[in-house]
Swiss-Prot record:
The name this protein goes by in its record: Tryprostatin B synthase ftmPT1
Keyword set includes Hydrolase: yes
Family label: Belongs to the tryptophan dimethylallyltransferase family.
Organism (species): Aspergillus fumigatus (strain ATCC MYA-4609 / CBS 101355 / FGSC A1100 / Af293) (Neosartorya fumigata)
The keyword RNA-binding is annotated on this UniProt entry: no
Its job: Brevianamide F prenyltransferase; part of the gene cluster that mediates the biosynthesis of fumitremorgins, indole alkaloids that carry not only intriguing chemical structures, but also interesting biological and pharmacological activities. The biosynthesis of fumitremorgin-type alkaloids begins by condensation of the two amino acids L-tryptophan and L-proline to brevianamide F, catalyzed by the non-ribosomal peptide synthetase ftmA.
Positions annotated to bind dimethylallyl diphosphate: 113, 201, 203, 294, 296, 380, 382, 446, 450
GO biological process: proteolysis; verruculogen biosynthetic process
Listed result of changing residue 279 to F: Slightly affects tryprostatin B synthase activity
Domain of life: Eukaryota
């Protein structure tokens, strides 16, 4: 039986009451923190209200945001007076605009997640060119604040996947070894449960480590997982995933290119030449015996035929749930009018002030290694919708919500989404949602939106 339809209530206030009340009593640590708060906290507050969090839980999460997250966002973005481009010194690999903050909305469960790339004023400078120090400090602070956070998995994966000081020095002395603009190695996220508990996650991107050691991303990721998985909980699922990756590398299951194949970018060269390439992993920061691992891979062929191949592991995963999920995924793809083509890794970021129309990137999948009896890890698809018209995308999502019986979401989501961006021209905006993910869990659709989470304030705002 499919899960109950998710909650969604209208929330269009420019200054939601919890945000307004806290703003009147906060002593900020710096002007940067104050500006980050007013640029982001109203969006978070509206998301919590519209997703029907209890009022006391809303205040708890906004307070957590102020005390833990704001100090980790680093210097506030600056607007270039000549180009009008708004950007931070450190370009975060978490967000295509380079910003270090992203709120995502799991609409299937009406749950909100806060993604953070913790930074300092030194991040991206010669003192800390790959931002290796601040994420650990941030997570250690989170572990002191939040019950149940266990950093064992973080330390284990950090040792295997993050460059050392000596390796950082090699990359600085030899810049041609790693020319990709995507330099983030550790990202973080907090799932805000409606009970008031928080699930903290860490994400590891080993491309700098790959460049300096000469080991492939796949080799680094797979060996790190096997090293921490001492009881072999993930072995069957991981081995089947590796077999699929190897078949793809040998040229099996590959459709014809649907568009003129563009040349590889500098970011592409950090990965396998195969169109389907291992990318990064994430882990829950709970006690190791309960921690899940998700293995992420990207696909440059963005079309439904390739989605179906990955979803079924080349036709090997064909249990009833997999096929029901695939049928629903086909409707989802059609409803959002997903574009298709061959998309390389972007040449660089699309900072605020640049045109986002037509911006393209590969799609991604994560494979959930959970230690269950299932021989294949459950996949979740992420399609890049940055560069597609944001209003049309939300209209397509509304069509899908009605298709699956999410009437409250269909009635209120579009208005709630647009309320987060009061100064945007929705006929032109193409950057308000970066990715949409789809999975099939517990007999129903599982959809998450990764949304733009920043409205500039003060002298950084766009001129009228």
């Amino acid at each position: 039986m499919p899960p109950a339809p998710p909650d969604q209530k209208p929330c269009h206030q420019l200054q939601p009451a919890p945000y307004r009340a806290l703003s009147e009593s906060i002593l900020f640590g710096s002007v940067d923190e104050e500006r980050w708060w007013h640029s982001t906290a109203p969006i978070l507050s509206r998301l919590l209200i519209s997703s029907n969090y209890d009022v006391d839980v809303q205040y708890k999460y906004l307070s957590l945001y102020r005390h833990l997250v704001l100090p980790a966002l680093g210097p506030y973005p600056q607007r270039d007076p000549e180009t009008g481009i708004i950007a931070t010194q450190w370009r975060s690999g978490m967000v295509l605009t380079g910003l270090p903050i992203e709120f995502s909305n799991n609409v299937a469960r009406a749950l909100i997640r806060i993604g953070v790339d913790p930074v300092t004023a030194d991040s991206g400078t010669a003192q800390d060119p790959f931002n290796t120090t601040r994420p650990k400090v941030y997570l250690e602070t989170a572990a002191r604040l939040l019950p149940g956070v266990d950093l064992t998995r973080f330390y284990e994966f950090e040792t295997e996947l993050v460059i050392t000081k000596a390796e950082e020095a090699v990359l600085q002395a030899n810049p041609d070894l790693f020319r990709s603009p995507w330099k983030s190695q550790i990202l973080t996220a907090m799932d805000l449960q409606k009970s008031g508990t928080v699930l903290v996650k860490a994400y590891f991107y080993p491309q700098p480590k790959s460049a300096v050691t000469g080991r492939s991303t796949e080799d680094l990721l797979v060996n790190a997982i096997r090293k921490v998985d001492r009881e072999g909980r993930f072995e069957t699922q991981l081995a089947n995933l590796q077999r699929y990756i190897e078949r793809r590398r040998r040229g099996l299951h590959v459709p014809g290119v649907t568009a003129d194949k563009p040349p590889a970018t500098a970011a592409d060269k950090a990965f396998d030449a195969c169109s389907f390439f291992p990318h990064f992993l994430s882990t829950d920061l709970v006690e190791p015996g309960k921690s899940r691992v998700k293995f992420y891979a990207s696909e440059r062929h963005v079309n439904l035929q390739m989605v179906e191949d990955i979803w079924t592991f080349g036709g090997l995963r064909r249990d009833p749930d997999a096929l029901r999920g695939l049928e629903l995924l086909r409707h989802f793809w059609a409803d959002i009018q997903m574009r298709e083509g061959y998309y390389t890794m972007p040449r660089g970021f699309c900072e605020l002030g640049k045109s986002s129309a037509g911006f393209e990137a590969p799609m991604m999948f994560h494979f959930h290694l959970d230690g269950s009896q299932s021989p294949f890890p459950d996949p979740q698809m992420y399609v890049c919708v940055f560069g597609m018209n944001s209003r049309k995308l939300v209209e397509g999502l509304t069509t899908f919500y009605r298709r699956v019986g999410w009437e409250e979401m269909a009635s209120h989501y579009q208005g709630n989404f647009l309320a987060n961006y009061p100064d945007e021209d929705f006929e032109k905006a193409a950057h308000l949602c970066a990715y949409v993910s789809f999975a099939y869990k517990n007999g129903g659709a599982y959809v998450t939106l990764y949304n733009h989470s920043f409205n500039p304030v003060g002298d950084v705002s766009f001129p009228n």
